[in-house]
């Protein structure tokens, strides 16, 4: 008899102050895919050096929306840093998209960016360059080693909270003040 598999899809990982990996220090990552082969997610609180306007220009997509052009593109993680990922909240699905949770999708399709540029795309979307990846069992080990806290994803945290507030606010959803935690452990 096999054990039921727990999926971490649609969970936010919140890096604890003791996180040893600088890619994820004070990071918040949305887990988009998780199975026996590993996990994939997108870091939600690291700005890249690019705006969405610059990315759209490189793709040959024009937009009249100043707000869209000024939107910060996230540094989604160290894996595939030249590849774009779009997390969006919508009833409509653009191109091939992966359902993360209730109306929340991930896509690498250019279609959603073109629709956003035309004003017909999802009203709430995050664009990231790169993603985070974990080998089979790696993320589970990191959880056991107390590198991460976990909370269910929340659309308001993803789309309505400023980047610099996401780390503390995500932990606050489960009553944790990250600034009161130490970054070392001891043995009794």
UniProtKB/Swiss-Prot annotation:
GO terms for cellular component: cytosol. Pfam families: DUF179. Belongs to the UPF0301 (AlgH) family. NCBIfam families: PRK00228.1-1. This is UPF0301 protein PD_1276. It comes from Xylella fastidiosa (strain Temecula1 / ATCC 700964).
